[in-house]
């Protein structure tokens, strides 16, 4: 089987992290985001993966070579010379996606969930039509494009309603699809939208179905959602009794959902959790309080610091008695001085912060 992952451009929404690494290589749950997807696709029998990108960073090429060997898949880049939207990249990769009649998966690189690729492929085969989109239920459908089914048909899609004013349903497009190669005939090689142009055309022919996603789902393309997605992912691991989580019997674990890389060092009298990810070679001093945060590789948190709703980038250091909260993001190699308060700062790489940041701001 084949798959195309829509990676796109420079990941500006996730800056300052994406100033250091391309978004697919930023670690989510201590593994590059793209690895969650590659692993799930390979497990479902996918052998060819295409990454649709606007630019091809060399660092990605070498990282993905490693995954090719590890998961026995072929990973190719399809590089757009101009941004082609969400449908154009499929046409650009037609030579790979249409090399046989088997259907192919398409997914957005920002989506984290329990990927249901195997079940999705079986469902798609059963109904025998042209396309299936994965949908997820949301509490506030008015913010999204909602999927409406045909009367008396649980999966065949009748129409899409963008940001509905009155309730028409609560299922939204989850950014994952399985499509027959015939769909490519509907797409021109130009900037074009799969959601607004291709899918409505397939719906008019009665050929598009939806598949309900069980479990959690999050688009983690910006820091606030990256943190929420981390909470959902850790909760999902807890439900599965995953060995990736620190046992609640550890003296520092407070409230569960804590992932600690084996190489990290944790001081005395710390309270860590709920919903914390600690990366490789992280050093945490004594009496530190961490909740709902991500600490990336080689970062350092000194004694008695207090960190909540924050992403601490690689090689960064947080001083003694410092306090970080309110979706603060430290880029690579940022230093926060002792006793400094940061309230929602987005701090670019290699900066040193010696003064409080009382209101959310970008520090360049």
Swiss-Prot record:
Pathway info: Nucleotide-sugar biosynthesis; GDP-alpha-D-mannose biosynthesis; GDP-alpha-D-mannose from alpha-D-mannose 1-phosphate (GTP route): step 1/1
Key word Flavoprotein present: no
Single Gene Ontology BP annotation: cell wall mannoprotein biosynthetic process
Single Gene Ontology MF annotation: GTP binding
Keywords: Cell cycle, Cytoplasm, GTP-binding, Nucleotide-binding, Nucleotidyltransferase, Transferase
A GO cellular component annotation in the UniProt record: cytoplasm
Family assignment from sequence similarity: Belongs to the transferase hexapeptide repeat family.
Name recorded for this polypeptide: Mannose-1-phosphate guanyltransferase
Species this chain originates from: Emericella nidulans (strain FGSC A4 / ATCC 38163 / CBS 112.46 / NRRL 194 / M139) (Aspergillus nidulans)
């Amino acid at each position: 089987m084949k798959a195309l992952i829509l990676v796109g451009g420079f990941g500006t929404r996730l800056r300052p992290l994406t100033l250091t690494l391309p978004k697919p290589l930023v670690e989510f749950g201590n593994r590059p985001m793209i690895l969650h997807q590659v692993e799930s696709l390979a497990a479902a029998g996918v052998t060819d993966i295409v990454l649709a990108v606007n630019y091809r960073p060399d660092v990605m090429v070498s990282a993905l070579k490693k995954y090719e060997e590890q998961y026995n898949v072929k990973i190719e880049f399809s590089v757009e010379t101009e941004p082609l939207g969400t449908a154009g990249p499929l046409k650009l990769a037609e030579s790979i996606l249409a090399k046989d009649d088997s259907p192919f998966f398409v997914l957005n690189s920002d989506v984290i969930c329990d990927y249901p690729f195997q079940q999705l492929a079986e469902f798609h085969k059963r109904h025998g039509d042209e396309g299936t989109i994965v949908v997820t239920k949301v509490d506030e459908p008015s913010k999204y494009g909602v999927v409406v089914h045909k009367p008396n048909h649980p999966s065949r899609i009748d129409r899409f309603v963008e940001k509905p004013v009155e309730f028409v349903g609560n299922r939204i497009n989850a950014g994952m699809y399985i499509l027959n190669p015939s769909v490519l005939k509907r797409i021109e090689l130009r900037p074009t939208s799969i959601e607004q142009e291709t899918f409505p055309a397939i719906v008019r022919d009665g050929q598009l179905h939806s598949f309900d996603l069980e479990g959690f789902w999050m688009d983690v393309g910006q820091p606030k959602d990256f943190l929420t997605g981390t909470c959902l992912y850790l909760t999902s691991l807890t439900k599965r009794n995953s060995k990736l989580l620190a046992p609640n019997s550890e003296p520092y674990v407070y409230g569960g959902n804590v992932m600690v890389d084996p190489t990290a060092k944790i001081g005395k009298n710390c309270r860590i959790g709920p919903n914390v990810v600690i990366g490789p070679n992280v050093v945490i001093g004594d009496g530190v309080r961490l909740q709902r945060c991500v600490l990336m590789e080689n970062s350092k948190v000194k004694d008695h610091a207090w960190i909540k709703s924050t992403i601490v980038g690689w090689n960064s250091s947080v001083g003694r008695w410092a306090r970080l909260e309110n979706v603060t993001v430290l880029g690579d190699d940022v230093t926060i001085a002792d006793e400094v308060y940061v309230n929602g700062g987005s701090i670019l790489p290699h900066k040193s912060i010696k003064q409080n940041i009382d209101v959310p701001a970008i520090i360049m």
